[in-house]
Structure formats: structure tokens, C-alpha cells
Regions:
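P-loop (Walker A) phosphate-binding loop of NTP-binding proteins
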Residues: 8
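ATP-binding Walker
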Residues: 11
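Hydrophobic anchor at the beta1->P-loop junction of P-loop NTPases
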Residues: 3-5
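Walker A/P-loop
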Residues: 14
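ATP-dependent NMP and nucleoside kinases share a basic, alpha-helical "lid"
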Residues: 94-100, 106-143
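ATP-dependent small-molecule kinase phosphotransfer cores
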Residues: 33-104
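Small-molecule kinase domains that catalyze NTP-dependent phosphoryl transfer to phosphate-bearing small molecules
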Residues: 120-121, 142-209
Length: 211
């Protein structure tokens, strides 16, 4: 069984995954972490990106410069689609290998699993972690040491998660992309309180899923 954990920036996805790992012993695959590692592990991936984007992403000694790629993505939305078209096949193969190494229940953590066509019908159960936008922004600023404007830009890039946070996701027509994506969610965990409260919510959600 693949349990997907998703949510917007600062929602507490990683906290939920740690609770699941500690309580149930399920291995966790962090898509965001693995993608960052791909840039080091697979030089051919960087070769493909540099060719597709027609720019250098490594310095003179061959070290990947994430800030360069981030700047390209931030300044041009089309760059993100190009990057995803190159990276997602690596992610798919890597996760398939992870599942083979870990028979049984596994957790797939990703912020974008509901918003990308690549992940359509992905996973057996989906947990969405949510919190008020202001709380998510404050958490992300403290965690990353980033300024508020930069964090807000990342929040704005997750429209579905914002629609969930402000409650407007239920206002969309049933045939809209937002409504279809949200319909995949099996459990919503609101992470706006203490760690004890969060742990109780996670245990309740998992116990229901595993019946």
C-alpha cells in the first residue's frame, strides 16, 4: 500500500511522515529530498536539463548550482514544466525501486502530488495536511530563514493547497481540476495545534486506512 502525504508549504507534511514512521515503522520516500539528490547522483540528468534549458547549471568545477535553476524557474513558469519533464521519469523509476526494496506499506511525501498530471491516480490512499495560510507562512519563514515575500511567492504557486486552506475548494464545480484533485483525498489532517493533537489525528487517520 502506498500512502501519499501531501500539503502546502509549512503545513507539516514532514511531521506527519515522521509520526507515521515512528508509530507504524513505514518507510518514507520524500520526493522533494530525492529530487535534490538526483542533481548530485545523476550527471546525465543535469546534462539533459542544461541542453533543454540552454544554460549552465554547474559552476566551473562541475558543482550543481541550485540557485541558478531556482532563479530560472522563478522568472519563467515554462521552465518548471521543462524541468519536470526531465526529472519526473527519474522520480518514477527511483520510487519504483524504493517500493521493491520495501514490500508492504510505504509513504510517499510530495507537495505537488495533487497538482501535477504526472501523479494522476498515484498512490492507494491520500492524506492532505493543512493549516491556515498565515500559520503555514510563519512556519516556513522560521524553518527556512526566508523572508516573507519569498515564502508568499511559493505559497501562491500552490493554488490548490490555498483553496483547501481558505475553504474555497468546495466551491468549484465537480468537473473542475481542483474538485477532481481534491476528490482523491481520503483524509484531511488539520495541523494547527500541538504535536500531541497532530499525533492523535495521524493515528486516527492511519488506523481508519489500515482497517
Amino acid at each position: 500500500m502506498v500512502i501519499v502525504v501531501t500539503g502546502g508549504i509549512g503545513s507539516g507534511k514532514s511531521q506527519v511522515c515522521r509520526i507515521i514512521a515512528d508509530r507504524y515503522g513505514f518507510p518514507v520516500y520524500s520526493a522533494d529530498l530525492r529530487v535534490r539528490q538526483f542533481y548530485v547522483e545523476f550527471p546525465e540528468l543535469l546534462d539533459a536539463l542544461e541542453t533543454s534549458l540552454n544554460c549552465a547549471l554547474r559552476n566551473d568545477v562541475g558543482t550543481f548550482q541550485p540557485s541558478v535553476l531556482a532563479g530560472k524557474i522563478f522568472s519563467d513558469n515554462s521552465v518548471l514544466k521543462t524541468v519536470e519533464s526531465v526529472v519526473f521519469p527519474y522520480l518514477s523509476a527511483d520510487f519504483a525501486a524504493f517500493v521493491q526494496r520495501n514490500p508492504g506499506h510505504v509513504v510517499f511525501e510530495s507537495a505537488t502530488v495533487l497538482e501535477k498530471d504526472f501523479f494522476a491516480d498515484f498512490g492507494d490512499a491520500v492524506i492532505l495536511v493543512d493549516a491556515p495560510v498565515e500559520l503555514r507562512v510563519d512556519r516556513a519563514c522560521r524553518r527556512d530563514g526566508a523572508d516573507r515575500q519569498r515564502v508568499m511567492a511559493r505559497v501562491d504557486a500552490q493554488p490548490l493547497m490555498n483553496a483547501v486552506s481558505n475553504g474555497s475548494v468546495n466551491d468549484y464545480p465537480e468537473d473542475s481540476s481542483f474538485a477532481k484533485a481534491f476528490a482523491r483525498v481520503d483524509k484531511v489532517i488539520i495541523n494547527d495545534g500541538t504535536m500531541d493533537k497532530l499525533e492523535e489525528a495521524v493515528i486516527s487517520a492511519l488506523d481508519d486506512m489500515l482497517i
